[in-house]
UniProtKB/Swiss-Prot annotation:
It comes from the Bacteria. Gene3D superfamilies: 3.30.300.20, Ribosomal protein S3, C-terminal domain (3.30.1140.32). Binds the lower part of the 30S subunit head. Binds mRNA in the 70S ribosome, positioning it for translation. This is Small ribosomal subunit protein uS3. One of its GO terms (molecular function) is mRNA binding.
Amino acid sequence: MGHKVHPTGIRLGISKDWNSKWYANKGDFAAYLAADLKVREMLRKKLAQAGVSKILIERPAKTARVTIHTARPGVVIGKRGEDIEKLRKEVSELMGVPAHINVTEVRKPELDAQLVAESIAQQLERRIMFRRAMKRSVGNAMRLGALGIKVNVAGRLNGAEIARSEWYREGRVPLHTLRADIDYGFAEASTTYGIIGIKVWIYKGEVFDFSQVGQEKQDDSPRNDRNDRGDRGDRPSRPAREAR
């Protein structure tokens, strides 16, 4: 049976960028990687209600810069910046260097695959029918400009004895096209019957300027050059051929 490669991993360096950007010597690499994992785990646990999409980590010149992409920046910052200052101190302790935290707002959470997956997971935990949750998320994404979306849920759906998977797709989701800007997200819903996994793929267009991922989209409409040639009366007359 065929298996799908991770859509982000296969596009790293082509149309996707890394979530951690730093260089380490051979002896420091493991410590840096472990610190990144601890920071991400801590932030996602403390900001579970803030709608965190992704966390970017950079280490420039013995400092650390953490960028949090969230749908609710007010929850992250807190009153007068108190909450974000506490987070900054905890991040500095985990990473062992002075840290700076930047907060970036996700303008359209309906087009962010990770936030869509977490939204479906929360609905399943509230005992909402999985088909209704899937179709609602698909409809919202297509309404806000997505070119395609696919949602897959797997587990004991509706409390069935035998686990199964169901998926729903609308539009195009070209996983084999490396220049396609495909956002991927995964979340788990903890229900009384067990864990239900949710995977979401969102196709936003094709990337041509890789320095600005997702900024430019390809025009998928078919070209019809004949319509742009004008009337026959507007064309210059061809010169007559000389007789041989």
